[in-house]
Amino acid sequence: MKIGILYICTGKYIVFWEDFYKSCQKYFLSNSDNVKKYYVFTDSDKIYGEVGNPNIHRFYQEALPWPDIALKRYEIFFQIKDILVEDTDYVFFFNGNSLFLDYIVWSEIAPDKQQGFLLSLSWNCYDGNQKFPYDRNIRSTAYIPYGKGDIYYQSGLTGGRTKEYIDLLQECREQTDIDYYNKVIAVYHDESHLNKFLLDRKIKVLSTNYGRPEKWKKPECAKMIFRDKYKIFGDEIYKMKGRRRKKLSASVFYRIAYLIKIKFHFK
């Protein structure tokens, strides 16, 4: 089976690539019958492992300011849709700070026909859908009214059969473009548009075992984590995301409060 892996590492985020690649090669669908092809979008002129490796494909991507690099994610990937159709059976996207810790086999994550051949990650740590951090701005194409939806998805891990995944990319790209034209930014950027696309769809839902923040203590047996950016970059992470540490906007304040809440939920 031909597995496509989408990955963005612009600017200083290139620091994550080598560890991600090594851990992915070792732990993710490492059966010899699977061929993993990496599609890496970066502004670096070289990346670890690419020399003499036909399965690493580097594409130039400028380091866009935050949150453009997140919002433009679907457009960036959609640009190589023809390559993905030709070269892959399934496609997965992983956040730049993803790191595999244990083996993940196909039977664990494979989405079937009843699941629309799509999958996404959900931390499942909310007290009912009224508390889901959906975009409640009616002007946004990502808008979801209160009372709707059964699951909130995290955008750090998504995937599926190539055809269905490209459909996801196309619709989310179109939603984002409409919002850009109307000068609207979805509350949690690409994640808000992902949740709108997946609203009321039956897909394969992956638990926190397949992607939790490094800071969380549970689950202890997580097979993949999202590395702590603050541990790598320190206070510079705030500059990289275009904000000052001591002067947070209301939306950022509530985002931090929300993360603190779910952190204690998993202790």
Where are these regions (language model features)?
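Short, solvent-exposed loop/turn segments at secondary-structure junctions
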Residues: 10-12, 45-47, 63-64, 98-100, ...
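Conserved donor-nucleotide/metal-binding helix-loop-beta segment in metal-dependent transferases, i.e.
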Residues: 100-138
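Short, hydrophobic beta-strand segments that form beta-sheet elements in well-ordered domains
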Residues: 36-43, 92, 117-118, 203-205
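Short catalytic/ligand-binding loop motif for oxyanion handling, primarily in non-cytosolic enzymes
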Residues: 15, 47-50, 100-103, 108-109, ...
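A conserved donor-nucleotide-binding helix/loop in the catalytic core
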Residues: 61-94, 102, 106, 189-198
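Catalytic core and acceptor-binding pocket of nucleotide-sugar-dependent glycosyltransferases
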Residues: 141-230
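Active-site regions of enzymes building and remodeling cell-envelope glycoconjugates
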Residues: 51-64, 74-76, 108-119, 221-225
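N-terminal anchoring/stem segment of glycosyltransferases
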Residues: 1-69, 80-87, 232, 248, ...
